[in-house]
Design a protein with these regions (language model features):
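Alpha-helical segment proximal to the catalytic Tyr-Lys
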Residues: 120, 162-167
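Short C-terminal tail/terminal secondary-structure segment
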Residues: 89, 220-246
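C-terminal substrate-recognition "lid" of short-chain dehydrogenase/reductases
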Residues: 202-226, 231
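Substrate-binding pocket helix/loop in short-chain dehydrogenase/reductase
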Residues: 90-92, 96-101, 191
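Residue(s) in the substrate-gating loop at a strand-loop-helix junction
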Residues: 134
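Canonical Rossmann dinucleotide-binding motif of NAD(H)/NADP(H)-dependent dehydrogenases/reductases
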Residues: 1-30
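Active-site helix of classical SDR
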Residues: 115, 150, 158
């Protein structure tokens, strides 16, 4: 398709799969990641894949990243805001103001700033913004305030951007559930039983939805949950073999 795609956190997991799938669709991809060696090795695998090293919490880094992407691809058609700081810490761990703010900078402020920096190019090209949230935007475990706040925020940012930038730019969000981004290959029967679809998700499950949304012209402002139905299961202690242990 020869589009110009930029992806944050593209060196591993979901972001890496997104990069691969756009490349295989015939696009050019420029990604930013903080893990330099891992990303350099990945970028060597594809001719039309370009890597920029940096921390997206820094707005100057984002500006330079966009300039680099334009230098390499000469256009930007799609922005995928994938990167986040996923450490599960919050009030029970006495997470500091500074640590909370950094998590917001990576997971919420950076997606806004990157969207702002790319706005004119996206409008010109009738582009797309795809934000990656999480089912943590809607349900929580203890001690997860920082991460949950970024994911709830990016859901709201999605529909706000969709209204501001439409009809020229369509903006959507994906909320993944349990996605295996590790080398673990085996899971217990109980793991599978917790998910109505009967499997643990893969980065490909999320990437497929990203590419799908980039092909549509009548979906915008939406957050689409991709979690195998896990968040839809109603659980009561002692019901249907579910037990809460204290």
């Amino acid at each position: 398709m020869n589009r110009g795609i930029i992806v944050t956190g593209g060196g591993h997991g979901i972001g890496k799969q997104i990069c691969v799938d756009f490349i295989q669709a015939g696009d050019k991809v420029c990604f930013i990641d903080i893990d330099e060696q891992r990303s350099i090795d990945f970028a060597k695998e594809y001719q039309n894949l370009f890597y920029f090293n940096g921390d997206i919490a820094d707005p100057l880094t984002l500006k330079r990243f966009v300039e680099y992407a334009m230098e390499k691809m000469h256009r930007i058609d799609v922005v995928v805001n994938n990167a986040s700081r996923s450490n599960n810490k919050g009030i029970l761990s006495s997470l500091t103001y500074e640590e909370f703010d950094y998590t917001l900078s990576v997971g919420l402020k950076a997606p806004y700033e990157l969207s702002r920096l790319c706005k004119d190019e996206l409008i010109k090209n009738k582009g797309r913004i795809i934000n990656i949230a999480s089912t943590r935007a809607f349900q929580s475990e203890p001690d997860s305030e920082a991460y949950a706040s970024t994911k709830g925020g990016i859901v709201a940012l999605t529909h706000a951007l969709a209204i501001s930038l439409g009809p020229d730019v369509l903006v959507n969000c994906i909320a993944p559930g349990w996605i295996n981004v590790t080398d673990q290959q085996e899971f217990s029967r109980e793991d599978f039983a917790a998910i109505p679809a009967g499997k643990v998700g893969t980065p490909k499950d999320i990437s497929d939805m990203v590419l799908f949304l980039c092909q549509q012209d009548f979906i915008t402002g939406e957050t689409i949950t991709v979690d195998g139905g896990m968040s839809k299961r109603m659980i009561y202690h002692g019901d249907w073999n579910w037990f809460y242990r204290l």
